[in-house]
Amino acid sequence: MNYQPTPEDRFTFGLWTVGWQGRDPFGDATRRALDPVESVRRLAELGAHGVTFHDDDLIPFGSSDSEREEHVKRFRQALDDTGMKVPMATTNLFTHPVFKDGGFTANDRDVRRYALRKTIRNIDLAVELGAETYVAWGGREGAESGGAKDVRDALDRMKEAFDLLGEYVTSQGYDIRFAIEPKPNEPRGDILLPTVGHALAFIERLERPELYGVNPEVGHEQMAGLNFPHGIAQALWAGKLFHIDLNGQNGIKYDQDLRFGAGDLRAAFWLVDLLESAGYSGPRHFDFKPPRTEDFDGVWASAAGCMRNYLILKERAAAFRADPEVQEALRASRLDELARPTAADGLQALLDDRSAFEEFDVDAAAARGMAFERLDQLAMDHLLGARG
């Protein structure tokens, strides 16, 4: 297989990813700032489909209207020159100190109103640039201590904010949807809507739930010790996987943002298998940080590695599914039975069926092996390149 990406693969990158300068809580930047235009051109050369941005990635915070127009003009020209797309945009409501207690759920009402206006302004730009999805990551929406935040009131304010944003895009006739990005902690000690499940439950309370989905990130769910492919499966099941952030993470620790495939490789395999078999048609968006040890050659090598690893795993997953032994092993593990309704004949038929309880042989059923180990080893063989 050719592992050279093309725009048809729909790989996208945030400007903040390749543009990360390597600054962390313990050390200063190790790389200069990247011009967004340079990022667009270099990613296009690597075979990417598009780029995404926070408002402050593209337009420095505090820019005048004329400066803003010039930044947007240069960026738009780079998009036109390269054919790169902007499928998604988002708002930075976490860097400036004004957001130290959050944006939509800050205790200070004036900060909340400012956060909404900042978001609305960037939604206008996102739509102008062709974005179909608007991501909301509430990195500062949370607390470090129990008395600092009444979570019920905070969720009311969160709901109010999203309802207002939904009202705005509807009134403007914008064809754009929102994707909530969960994260359990960091930078706040505890963040509201910490997992995919929390976000899905929250969405059902909104006035226009059809406008809202989720943008799960590999590392964020794995920071909480959760199974990322399972979370994605539930989002797909709910019809709410509006966007996805791909990266690498090694277990429960800080948010590593490794290149995709460089963390939990087995989870990455099952994730790609799921996305491809489910027919997910959205962008494969990489939200990672090239390590601060790297110069710009390393930055572009890391970005290329994200795409290459996805394509390799896509090939391995396809070979796994096409393998006759795997298909037989799936039947031996009774995956086909799981797909059958338990009581398609209805409740009364279930109650009348003596074989379902009175005559059910629990000992025989308990003695049946599931053959999961053989199935899993076949998956490992394909992942490691020993088959197909």
Curated annotation (Swiss-Prot):
Class of the enzyme per the UniProt entry, highest EC level: isomerase
Keywords per UniProt: Carbohydrate metabolism, Cytoplasm, Isomerase, Magnesium, Metal-binding, Xylose metabolism
Gene Ontology CC: cytoplasm
Residues holding Mg(2+) 2: E217, H220, D255, D257
Active site per database record: H54, D57
Keyword Ribonucleoprotein: no
Entry similarity comment: Belongs to the xylose isomerase family.
Subunit structure comment from the entry: Homotetramer.
Protein name from the UniProt record: Xylose isomerase
